[in-house]
Amino acid sequence: MKVLTFGEVMLRLKTPEHLKILQADTFEANYGGAEANVAVSLATLGDDVSYVTKVPEHQVGQAAVNEIRRFGVDTSRVLRGGGRVGIYYFEKGTNIRPTSVIYDRAYSAIAMAKAEEFDWEKLLDGVDFFYFSGITPAISTEIEKALENALALCREKKIQVVCDLNYRGKMWSTKDAQRVMRRLMAYVDVCIANDEDFESSLGIPAYDGDMSRGIE
């Protein structure tokens, strides 16, 4: 079984322990992203997994690729070019203080990529399953187009498509998410989501607050 995932890899800068960003004078650095994390998880379970993204041709971009590849993920399909890797700052919550995330991902290599840069005939060669999350089409309109091109070819090639709705309110509104995700659902074979994501991404009220309904 060959799996291909498509999305953005980012540099995560986390405050030590439970320090707030305002308190920190150092940050713990690592790399990840929804689709990259799925690729790594599947690879560690022994699956044959490839990952598609775009990163700059400098040491930070290469470090991101190295981090994913060291877990056994095939990174040979990663595109190179552009100016920067997206960053997010992570402040872990404690007690009643919630976790906080600040995105700095504008103008990243993948956000500035054009749809035609992704040669899906080659990228999907030999693939059995294609995975993406709702984060990917929110990156840019060009990546939305690139994703839909991939999905259309998956349908033609009878490649199974798996989507995790994974709604991110800091990236787009529910109106924009529903406009895009409802259309993309036509290509999806397996959809993964919690009740909040179903409502935010698709406008489907999947939970009415009555816990007792779980027994029905």
What do the PLM-derived regions correspond to, one by one?
Residues M1-D74, A113-A115:
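Glycine-rich phosphate/adenosyl-contacting loop at the front of the ribokinase-like
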Residues V9, I135, L165:
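Active-site metal-binding loops of divalent metal-dependent hydrolases
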Residues D48-G134:
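Conserved N-terminal subdomain of the carbohydrate kinase-like
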Residues Y51, V161-C163, C191:
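Hydrophobic faces of well-ordered beta-strands that scaffold small-molecule active sites
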Residues F118, E144-N149, T174-R182:
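Charged helix-capping and loop-helix junction motifs
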Residues T136, Y167-G169, D197:
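Active-site-proximal loop/turn and secondary-structure-junction residues that shape catalytic pockets
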Residues L153-Q160:
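A short helix->loop->beta-strand "cap" motif at the edges of active sites that frequently abuts
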Residues M171-E216:
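Conserved phosphate/ATP/ADP-binding segment of small-molecule kinases
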